């Protein structure tokens, strides 16, 4: 929006409403221009305490207030299927619901937690680790630890930290395939189990691991630079990545505990990362 304001103000002047991608599908289905709470909370334009668009931020950026649509709670009715779609598909009127547009919050709804205080870990290419709160925590400590407050189902706050996930494993596997060594993820886990434990650690969030490419070589260079044993075999590299991720999760949990003042007995893990028995076990350890 700020780019448009500075470089293509003519487009912004013609805009009626800003509709985020998940809300666009609801608009196509119903004709209603609404903003679902969870996806709106990811824009940095939401007041986390009020659950409304932040007039303070919008005014500071000099953005037109009229383009921001009404925010609707997650899990509530947006509208009904349009007459045109009903006729085309031969359907009766159907309610269209505002499901959690933010995929992490959608996954979190499925967490089978019975206790009030728990840690969730949504693990895929990225990992998101956090807890649910009734109210946001916005202070110097949460800012220092770079922990965010995102909106969720039932008006709850997901107090969470973004961490790299299985990206390093995925990119390492692609590199080995380029080198003529193609292994399935199950094969990589078997090799990792046979490698020595707690030999070396990387910071998975270090900037050198973000670009695609030869991640195994970057891991070895990181270990040399930090005075650690260097993982040479494929199994050693995979074990290093998994143990480093588990250690990163532990570190993030300690930061969340420090901010909330709560103790957590249970971690619920969801997402594609749960298919890795090795990562699940290291995380539990």
Question: What label would you give each PLM region?
Answer:
Residues 2-34, 45-55, 59-60, 83-267, ...:
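Active-site core segments that coordinate phosphate-bearing ligands/cofactors
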Residues 41-46, 72-76:
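Conserved short loop/turn motifs at secondary-structure junctions
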Residues 6, 76-77:
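Glycine-rich, mobile lid/loop segments that gate access to catalytic sites or pores
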Residues 35-40:
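Nucleotide/phosphate-binding loop and acidic/charged catalytic motifs
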Residues 76, 273-274:
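Short, surface-exposed acidic/glycine-rich loop or hinge patches that mediate macromolecular interfaces
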Residues 61-74:
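A conserved helix-loop-beta module that forms one wall/lid of the active-site cleft
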